[in-house]
Amino acid sequence: MSELLSVALFLASVLIYAWKAGRNTWWFAATLTVLGLFVILNITLYASDYFTGDGINDAVLYTLTNSLTGAGVGKYILPGIGIALALVAVFGALGWILRRRRHHPHHVGYSLLALLLALGSVDASPAFRQITELVKSQMRDGDPDFAVYYKEPAKTIPNPKLNLVYIYGESLERTYFDNDAFPNLTPELGALKNEGLDFSHTMQLPGTDYTIAGMVASQCGIPLFAPFEGNASASVSSFFPQNICLGDILKNSGYQNYFVQGANLRFAGKDVFLKSHGFDHLYGAEELKTVVADPSYRNDWGFYDDTVLDEAWKKFEALSRSGQRFSLFTLTVDTHHPDGFISRTCNRKRYDYDGKPNQSFSAVSCSQENIAEFINKIKASPWFKDTVIVVSSDHLAMNNTAWKYLNKQDRNNLFFILRGDKPQQETLAVKRNTMDNGATVLDILGGDNFIGLGRSSLSGQSLSEVFLNVKEKVLAMKPDIIRLWNFPKEIKDFTVDRDKNMIAFSGSHFRLPLLLRVSDKRVEPLPESEYSAPLRFQLADFAPRDNFVWIDRCYKMAQLWAPALALSTDWCVSQGQLGGQQTVQHVDKAQWKGKTAFKETVIDVTRYQGNVDTLKIVDNDIRYKADSFIFNVAGAPEEVKQFSGISRPESWGRWSNAQLGDEVKIEYKAPLPKKFDLVITAKAFGDNANRPIPVRVGNEEQTLVLGHDVSTITLHFNNPTDANTLVIAPPAPVSTNEGNILGHSPRKLGIGMVEIKVVNVES
C-alpha cells in the first residue's frame, strides 16, 4: 500500500510542478533533488532485491557499498550497467519534464505543494523506511528486552544417548517443497520431510540471512551482528567468545563434533566459528582433496554435493562403528545462487518451469536427491535407532533464476527432524525462526530448551510468537548482540606476529591484512574478505580526520608514503590521517611491537584528495620503479604502458589467464632495444609443461619450454622493426579452480610468471 502511495505522490509532484509551478531555479533544483532521491532510493531497493532477494538489509548495504566480488559476479554486471543507464535516463527525463513550462511565471503555492508531495513520496517509500530502520539500529544503545529473553543454557546434557546428524542445505528453503507450486521438484527429500517433525513456519530474521549468519543463529540462538561485516569473519581469531552454543554443549557432554563441507572452511570464518564452539574435526575443500575419489571434480565453490555427502557417510559409518558419541554437521553448496550446480550422479539433471529449463530448480532437484540418498543410507543402517537427523536451510534463497517464482509463495526456511529412537510424523505450524533450531535440537537430545534468544519449538515460545514486530525487535537488540563480542574500545599498543600473519591488541586477535578506524571509545575493524573491497579502497572512503591503522603488504601503501618499499611483500604498518600526517613502518621482526601515535594536525585538503585518488588507482594501473616486471606485486614497471591476459598477483607471482586474453601481452611505452635478452622466470601449468610456448616480439618468434617448477630461461631477440610489445602464447590453457578465489568462475591457466626482465645487449 505504501509503495502505491509513494508512487502516486511522486507522479502528483511531477505533474503539479511541470504544469503549474512555472520558472524558478531554486524551486526547480529543490524539487528535482527530492524527486531524484525518490528515484535513487527505489532503484537501490530494486538492486538490493536483485542481488539478495531481501530488500535493503545489513548485508546488502555492505555489498552495494563495496566491490561486488565473489560468487557469480559476472552474472550481475549487465543488470548493474542497466540500472546505471536507467538512472541517467530517468534523471534526464525528469529534468526535461519539470522544465516544460519554464517560460511561465513562477507560482510559489504550486511549487511548495509539489515539493511537499515529493517529500511525502520519499517518506512513504518502502526503501526509505528500510534504510531508516537500519540507521536506527546502528544508533540505538540496545533494547531492555534483550536481558529478559537472552538465556544461557546449561553447559552439558545429562546422560546423552543420541548421536546427531545436522544437514545444512544451501539456500534450500521450504518453499521449494510446495508440490502445488513446483510439481515433483523435491520428491525424495520431500517424502522424508513428511515422515518426520516438519516445522512449517520458520521465518528469516535480520542477521540470519547468509550462510555463516544462519549457522550462528541455528547454533548460538543469536543473529550474526558484529562490529564488522559478517562475511569478513575470517579475519577474527575467536567468534562470539562469551557465548555458549550447541557445539560447546555437545563437546562438554562427551560428543566428538565433526563438520564436512565442499567449500574452503576459511570463507566467512566458518573455521573460526566452529573451532571457537566445540568442533575439533573440520573438513573442507583443502582437507578433502587428498581423500576424495576425484580431486578434479569440483564446481566454483568446491566439491559437489554428491562427493561431500559420500564423505559424510563414510564419517558417519566410521564414527558409529567406534561407539563414540558424536555429532556430524554437513553443508551442501550445489544450490548456491545465482544458478547452482548439477552433480554428475543425479538421476534428474533438468527441471523445466514455465516450459523451459531452469538451472536453479534443476540444482535444487539434484541436490535434494543427494541429501535424500545420504539420509536413506543412515536410515537403513543399524545405527539409525541411536541417531537424530536434522535437515535445515541455512537461509532463504538469494536472487537466483528461480527467485521470482519463489517470491510468489509464502516463503519459509526448511527445518525438519527425523528421530531414529522415536519416530514422529507431524507438521508443526508454530511461528518460529532460525534461532530456535539449536534449542529445539538440544531439547530433543535431553538438554535445556533454550539457547540465547532461541527457544525449543517443542516446549518453548519463540520470539516470533512473542513479538508481532519481531524483525524490528531483533534490530533493536543489535547493539546488545554486538557487545557479546567483547570487542576492545581502544588501541594503544599492538603486536604484529609476522609468521602467523596476526595482529593482537587489547586482548583481541585478527588475521592480516587489517584496517582499523580509531575514534574515541571505538575501534572499528575493517578486514579484507572475498566480498569486500581491497583495504586501500576502503581507506579511501575515510574522512580527512579519521584516525587509521593499516597493516598490509608494504607495496600496497608504498606508492603513497614509502617508495623505497614499492617491491616489498613484507608486512608494513601505516597510521595517521588521510588529510594529515601518515607514517609507514616495516615489520622487521617475528614479534613486532608498535604503538598508536595520532597527532593533532592541520588538515590539508589537497593532500587528502591526492591520497584518496592514489588509493583508488586500480591494480593494473599502478606503476613502480624497477628494471624488471615483478609479478607478485600489483601493477607494472614505469616502462610498461599496459598489459593483458594476466591474472591477479599471488604470493609467488601471477598466472596467465586465457579468460582475460588468449595471449599474455605486455606493451611498453618505448620500442624495445634492437637487440636484447629476455630473461623469464616462470613455470607451466598442466599440459603446458614441457611444450614449446611461443614468445613473440614484432616479427621474431622464439620458443620457451617450462616445467611444473619455477625456472629461469633467457631468450635472445633481434628487434629491427622497433616493436614495443611482448607476446607469450601458452599452447594449452587449462580451465581450473586451482588457487582461485572462492566462488569465482574457473580461470584458464597457462604459465605462472615470477619475473620478466629485458636486458639491452646492443653493442
Curated annotation (Swiss-Prot):
<dbReference type="GO" id="GO:0008960">
    <property type="term" value="F:phosphatidylglycerol-membrane-oligosaccharide glycerophosphotransferase activity"/>
</dbReference>
<comment type="pathway">
    <text>Glycan metabolism; osmoregulated periplasmic glucan (OPG) biosynthesis.</text>
</comment>
<keyword id="KW-0812">Transmembrane</keyword>
<dbReference type="Pfam" id="PF00884">
    <property type="entry name" value="Sulfatase"/>
</dbReference>
<feature type="transmembrane region" description="Helical">
    <location>
        <begin position="108"/>
        <end position="128"/>
    </location>
</feature>
<feature type="transmembrane region" description="Helical">
    <location>
        <begin position="1"/>
        <end position="21"/>
    </location>
</feature>
<dbReference type="Pfam" id="PF22895">
    <property type="entry name" value="DUF7024"/>
</dbReference>
<dbReference type="GO" id="GO:0005886">
    <property type="term" value="C:plasma membrane"/>
</dbReference>
<comment type="function">
    <text>Transfers a phosphoglycerol residue from phosphatidylglycerol to the membrane-bound nascent glucan backbones.</text>
</comment>
<comment type="similarity">
    <text>Belongs to the OpgB family.</text>
</comment>
<protein>
    <recommendedName>
        <fullName>Phosphoglycerol transferase I</fullName>
        <ecNumber>2.7.8.20</ecNumber>
    </recommendedName>
</protein>
<feature type="transmembrane region" description="Helical">
    <location>
        <begin position="26"/>
        <end position="46"/>
    </location>
</feature>
<keyword id="KW-1133">Transmembrane helix</keyword>
<dbReference type="InterPro" id="IPR050448">
    <property type="entry name" value="OpgB/LTA_synthase_biosynth"/>
</dbReference>
<keyword id="KW-0808">Transferase</keyword>
<feature type="transmembrane region" description="Helical">
    <location>
        <begin position="77"/>
        <end position="97"/>
    </location>
</feature>
<dbReference type="InterPro" id="IPR000917">
    <property type="entry name" value="Sulfatase_N"/>
</dbReference>
<dbReference type="InterPro" id="IPR054288">
    <property type="entry name" value="DUF7024"/>
</dbReference>
<keyword id="KW-1003">Cell membrane</keyword>
<keyword id="KW-0472">Membrane</keyword>
<dbReference type="InterPro" id="IPR020881">
    <property type="entry name" value="OpgB"/>
</dbReference>
<dbReference type="GO" id="GO:0009250">
    <property type="term" value="P:glucan biosynthetic process"/>
</dbReference>
<dbReference type="InterPro" id="IPR017850">
    <property type="entry name" value="Alkaline_phosphatase_core_sf"/>
</dbReference>
<keyword id="KW-0997">Cell inner membrane</keyword>
